[in-house]
Amino acid sequence: MTTIELLEKLTSPAGVAGEETSSFEALKGLFSLYGDVSTDVSGNIIIHKDGKGKHILLDAHLDTIGFVVTGITDEGFIRVQKVGGVDMRTVEGMELTFHGKEDVYGVVCTVPPHLSDGESKVSADGTCVVDIGMIKEDAEN
């Protein structure tokens, strides 16, 4: 497995804080290639490999920053609230993936330059709306 393939396997699963199960399972699967994998009551992954070599500790966060859905507007836009250290200055126009029964893709809405008053401000409360190209009824399903 190349370094790029390894990084893709580690970063592809959705693992927003509080919903890390898919990231956790992916990591356990990768580590099982190297030894016996178990977990403790705190959710730590432990790999045991027979031998007399040195022990190592890999200490890292498993979760990622992201958003949680807080509502759907009458026009079908998705209202979201940041989870974790999202820098709201960087999200305008960003593509987001909503994980549900099926993945749904959307783009964080921005005010077009010709409609802007030139005083565009970053969301102070960590909220924004996302256009998924659906009407409200379809978005709710």
Task: Name each region found by the language model.
Residues 1-141:
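N-terminal hydrophobic/helix-forming segments and targeting peptides
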